[in-house]
Amino acid sequence: MLYIIRHGKTDMNAKMLMQGRSDQPLNDAGIGQAEEAASRFAAMGIEIDKVYSSPLGRAVRTAEIIAPHSERVIDGRLIEMDYGPYEGMDLRDPAPEVMDFFEDFVNVPAPDGMEPLSDVVARMGSFLEDIRREAAEKNILISTHAIAMKGALEYLTPDSHGSYWAKNIGNCDIYAAEVKDGKYTVPVILDDGRER
């Protein structure tokens, strides 16, 4: 079984700043979110066998809190989208070209200097193919970031037509997918009724 989680909250998240490759630590709220996610897994009887994490500290720490005794592997393909010159931009007052992109991810290309969404999907897809057999036999947790996670969900749902790009994925939201007959199932949000 495959579980994909977005890292817990950071100060940049709280300040509504565009956070891509900036290596920000979890804040107290983010640590609490990761602890809550660990409790959710425990309450559902899910034991994580292995963790794959983005190299950024917020994703690594989220994974450590959720699965402290599981094998952990860092994979650079799980890093967040490269926002280039827009890194750190205030999302309450984005540049016009970024606003156009955010309003229509499917038809408007990423602004110059920003990683194209097709590249995010390609690297996440490459990673998912590499662990497919392992995910059929073990409970695998992927600790990553919002846009990288959306790239994985887009890859796993070929007929989504870009619907995940506009979907809000909150800190420590979890999606799950199985491997059946050698293929990934469509991912579903792991929702135990908690308030969002």
Model-derived segments and spans:
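Short beta-strand scaffold positions
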Residues: 53-54, 122, 143-144
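Generic beta-sheet signal
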Residues: 2-3, 138-147
